[in-house]
Design a protein with these regions (language model features):
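N-terminal helix-turn-helix DNA-binding core of bacterial DNA-binding proteins
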Residues: 11-52
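Beta-hairpin "wing" of winged helix-turn-helix
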Residues: 61-76
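N-terminal leader segment of winged-helix/HTH proteins
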Residues: 1-20, 157-162
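Residue-level detection of the helix-turn-helix DNA-binding "recognition helix"
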Residues: 44-47, 57-58, 62
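C-terminal regulatory/oligomerization modules of transcriptional regulators
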Residues: 94, 98-163
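Basic, amphipathic "hinge/linker" alpha-helix immediately C-terminal to the N-terminal HTH DNA-binding motif
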Residues: 21, 72-93
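Alpha-helical linker/hinge and terminal dimerization helices associated
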Residues: 16, 26, 63, 92-103
Length: 163
C-alpha cells in the first residue's frame, strides 16, 4: 500500500517530509536558494512539467516555505521567494548535498561548492556537535523522548537510553 501522507505521525521528521518530502519540492527549494524566483526559470532549470511545478509551488506557498509576490501591480506575473521558514531549510540542503558528494559523486568533482560569500572560503562540513563545538560520532548520539512525545515513543526511547 502506498503512503500518501505522514500528517498523522507524531514525529518531527514525518512532519518535515509532509512539507518537503517530494523530490521536486526539494529541488524547487534548492533553486530558490540559488536565486531562482520566476516560474519560467524554475521550469527551465528543472525540466519539470508546468502542472507539477504549479502544484509544488502552491504547496510550498501554503506551507509557508515560499512567499508568492506580484512583480507589478495589476499583472499576473509573480515571483516566489523563500520565507524565514524556507531559509531555515538551508542546513537540510547543505547536508543532503554533502551526502550526495560522498555517496553519489561526480567523476569530475563536486557539482557545487558552498563558500562564505565575503571570503570565498568553503564552508565547514556540517556535522553534529556538542554545544561547545566538539564533533560527535553516531555512537555518541542517542534519541530521547521530548516533551511532545507520545506515550508509545517515550516507551520506545526508554529502551535505547543509556542513562
Amino acid at each position: 500500500m502506498k503512503r500518501t501522507s505522514f500528517a498523522q505521525f507524531n514525529c518531527s521528521l514525518a512532519q518535515t517530509l509532509e512539507v518537503i518530502g517530494d523530490w521536486w519540492t526539494l529541488m524547487i527549494v534548492r533553486d530558490a536558494f540559488f536565486g531562482t524566483t520566476r516560474f519560467e526559470a524554475f521550469q527551465q532549470d528543472l525540466g519539470i512539467a508546468r502542472n507539477i511545478l504549479t502544484q509544488r509551488l502552491k504547496h510550498l506557498v501554503e506551507q509557508g516555505v515560499l512567499e508568492r509576490r506580484p512583480l507589478t501591480k495589476g499583472r499576473k506575473q509573480c515571483e516566489y521567494v523563500l520565507t524565514e521558514k524556507g531559509r531555515d531549510l538551508l542546513p537540510v540542503l547543505l547536508a543532503a548535498t554533502q551526502w550526495g558528494d560522498r555517496w553519489a559523486p561526480n567523476r569530475r568533482g563536486k557539482r557545487v561548492v558552498f563558500v562564505e560569500a565575503t571570503t570565498g572560503r568553503p564552508i565547514v562540513h556540517l556535522a553534529p556537535s556538542t554545544a561547545r563545538g566538539k564533533p560527535l560520532r553516531m555512537e555518541e548520539i542517542e534519541p530521547r523522548a521530548g516533551p511532545g512525545a507520545s506515550p508509545e515513543a517515550k516507551a520506545r526511547f526508554s529502551l535505547y537510553s543509556s542513562s
